[in-house]
């Protein structure tokens, strides 16, 4: 075994703030936090729906709290931001080739947003 001390580069807790690429990545990954709150609220809402009308009314009054509404709006914005970054990466990760020609990136991204809009409209009409 060697007596040499190996070089260990110092890593601060805020290392990601220095590089715009990593800062963007961390912001993108942080969008999960409001989504976790939204998912927990929906789970409790399903539980209240099963428990009966009084529990359901209590959950509805909780969901109408302005702080909860703001958190749900943040969750929606975070979800849309996450989807936009995911959709813009998709053509680079998995390029689609039709008859030997690569499909334009904007067509792929717009097709994904069209699918989101169609599914959202279908669910809106269904409910």
From Swiss-Prot:
It holds the Pfam family Fumarate_red_C. GO terms for molecular function: succinate dehydrogenase activity. CDD domains: QFR_TypeD_subunitC (cd00546). InterPro entries: Fumarate_red_C, SQR/QFR_C/D. It comes from the Bacteria. The keyword Oxidoreductase does not apply. GO terms for cellular component: fumarate reductase complex; plasma membrane. The keyword Cell inner membrane applies. The chain crosses the membrane at residues 30-50, 67-87, 107-127. Its main location: membrane. It is found in: Cell inner membrane. Keywords: Cell inner membrane, Cell membrane, Membrane, Transmembrane, Transmembrane helix. Anchors the catalytic components of the fumarate reductase complex to the cell membrane, binds quinones. Belongs to the FrdC family. This is Fumarate reductase subunit C. It comes from Photobacterium profundum (strain SS9).
């Amino acid at each position: 075994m060697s007596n040499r001390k190996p070089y260990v580069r110092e890593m601060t807790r805020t290392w990601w703030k220095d590089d715009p690429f990593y800062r963007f990545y961390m912001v993108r990954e942080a969008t999960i936090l409001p989504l976790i709150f939204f998912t927990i609220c929906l789970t409790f809402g399903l539980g209240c729906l099963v428990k009966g009308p009084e529990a359901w009314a209590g959950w509805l009054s909780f969901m109408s709290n302005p702080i909860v509404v703001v958190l749900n709006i943040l969750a929606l914005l975070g979800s849309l931001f996450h989807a936009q970054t995911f959709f813009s990466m998709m053509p680079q990760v998995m390029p689609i080739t039709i008859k030997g020609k690569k499909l334009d990136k904007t067509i792929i991204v717009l097709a994904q947003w069209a699918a989101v809009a169609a599914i959202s409209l279908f669910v809106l009409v269904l409910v």
